[in-house]
């Protein structure tokens, strides 16, 4: 029997094509490729904070194609091609380690080229489903070094719980006190294009200072900074900075920005921004 390949899931965001411009969705998500018991290729996307899939597409065996956008400077923008139509669904990779992109492409090629045997329909009814290959981000040793690995969950032989045990567990958890989950503050929710563009419009001096850090071809047009704020490269940079702060590198980043690190910079994004604000106020008072 031609056994179906493992499912592949990795961090990826959505993007939208408008005319000839691809605009990235700032949300973080997961993109999953797999093969159904019927032999169809299934592609699903969901936000990381939800278990519900927003996108779900099915392809006949051998017809799914996940193609890299050659015009993208970072090389991390892809589109899902639909043969026989002009439809294209765009996604951009959000894994921190760019070098791991090749592993993702290789794993997807296996799924794209999978063609089930004619007798697979009968055997798949009693066959066990393939495990999922999750391409996940391991904690880096420093904010610039990341690792991406393919992990395969081990099969379990634990027998299913009885109905009596399930009822007991439900009763146990129903009596436990619940605590409201505090939303995590991230730079991605603060430094959005929707927030930054009006701010820069009202602060032209800051905008002028930032333009000098753009590529030379962008510096001639001040409005090009708006395009940068919507780009996948900018969103990826914000996500990497977020990760470094949450991994405890806030004091180092504060120091690189020319401010004196405080204990607050070790307390996530909120503490990091508080440290920056305090440093800015201190410099103003010393003038």
Curated annotation (Swiss-Prot):
It is found in: Cytoplasm; Nucleus. It holds the Pfam family RPN13_C. GO terms for biological process: asexual reproduction; cell differentiation; cellular response to nutrient; proteasome assembly; regulation of sorocarp development; transcription elongation by RNA polymerase II. Disulfide bonds: none annotated. Residues 130-162 are annotated as: Disordered. Residues 2-118 form the Pru domain. The keyword Nucleus applies. Residues 177-286 form the DEUBAD domain. Keywords: Cytoplasm, Nucleus, Phosphoprotein, Proteasome. Functions as a proteasomal ubiquitin receptor. Recruits the deubiquitinating enzyme uchl5 at the 26S proteasome and promotes its activity. Plays a role in the transition from growth to differentiation. PANTHER family: ADHESION REGULATING MOLECULE 1 110 KDA CELL MEMBRANE GLYCOPROTEIN, PROTEASOMAL UBIQUITIN RECEPTOR ADRM1. Interacts with the 26S proteasome. Interacts with phg2. This is Proteasomal ubiquitin receptor ADRM1 homolog.
